[in-house]
Amino acid sequence: MKLFIWVQHLFGLGHARRMARIAGACGADGMDVSVAAGGPDGADIFRGLTNVSAHQLPPLRTSDAAYSGLLTDEGAAPDEAYWATRRDALLARLRAVQPDILLIELFPFGRRKFASEVLALIEAAKALPTRPLIACSVRDIVEPKEDPKKTAEMAGWLKAHFGAVLVHGDETVLPLTATAPFAGDVGVPLHYTGYVAPDAPSATTKAGVVVSAGSGASGEALVNVAIAVAKDHALPARPWHIFVPPHLDPPASSGPNVHIHPFSPDFTSYLAGAEVSVGEAGYNTTVEALALGARPVLVPYVEAGQTEQPTRAKAFAKAGRAAYLPAKDLNPMMLLSTVEAARSLPPATSLNLSGAKHASLILKGLRRDSVPS
């Protein structure tokens, strides 16, 4: 069974990493997986996965965190010729693969600026000698659109072109229809895969609290408050490990039992040994903490008008899976009390964190059901 994936990351690598876990699970499950990656160095994220080949499209990225524009690697806005080159490469790859399943990441729930490209891909897929199952892959939360015309157009695309939506979340924690009500109104089945989490690495260090921060102003504030708390409250049995983004230059040491690190791939091995994880409420940050056994304290990113992270933090807190600290309330006393509250949270043993494997099973089942016997 052949699977073709379209994925486009714009700001950070979260979307591509989640799709790499899904592609890897599908490949390990015996599918022949081809990926068309449109973000900078996107194809590299898929290298080395079993039965997965990745093709790099001419890359595009966002100009800022508000997704106000697109830029090429040279920092220029893409012109018609650039878009045509991307489209031609994408469609040539699709026709070479002749997939049984076409999996499109996020669209039509997002990536609106890529509508012409994705719709051309869909029409080309429909014109193949054997029409593939066309499915959407979407995370647990969709940023709502204020313009009802845009919402109606998204609903129209979903109804007209897609046979299924794979939702990488848990309906009991937060249904997709909470942030995209139209998804429940157009007759396209929603299949909840569970959360797409990484395999757990071995813990190399016993860490009481692990703090990770993003690159924006909110990340800098979180690092500074965490250092202020840790220098007075870290204990030998409960050290604090604070991982900072490259642009910050915190003190090399802030007291005994406090360890400050540049962000690195070793982060997850520390997280695997942590009792509590303090970080923003992005999809991967939240799910990795739960999968690795740490109790999450979620301090969501709220810059650039984003609602995704506060929505996720509130939902996980309501479900008893995380402690929620709004960014506006972030100070040393509140962070300390929230960390202490998180210690009493139950482990995530009953939460479905095998979303990549379940996505593969769902896709194979849907394809089998769609082929006339």
What residue ranges belong to the model's regions?
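Nucleotide-activated donor-dependent transferases that construct or modify glycoconjugates
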Residues: 1-12, 104-106
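Conserved nucleotide-sugar phosphate-binding/catalytic loop shared by glycosyltransferases and other
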Residues: 3, 27-81
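A short, glycine/small-residue-rich beta-strand->loop->alpha-helix junction that serves as a flexible
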Residues: 7-20, 219-220
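Donor-nucleotide binding loops and adjacent catalytic segments primarily
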Residues: 23, 180, 195-276, 310, ...
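Conserved nucleotide-sugar donor-interacting segment of glycosyltransferase catalytic cores
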Residues: 91-159
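A nucleotide-sugar donor-handling region in carbohydrate enzymes
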Residues: 137-220, 243-248
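A donor-sugar binding/catalytic signature common to diverse glycosyltransferases
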Residues: 267-311
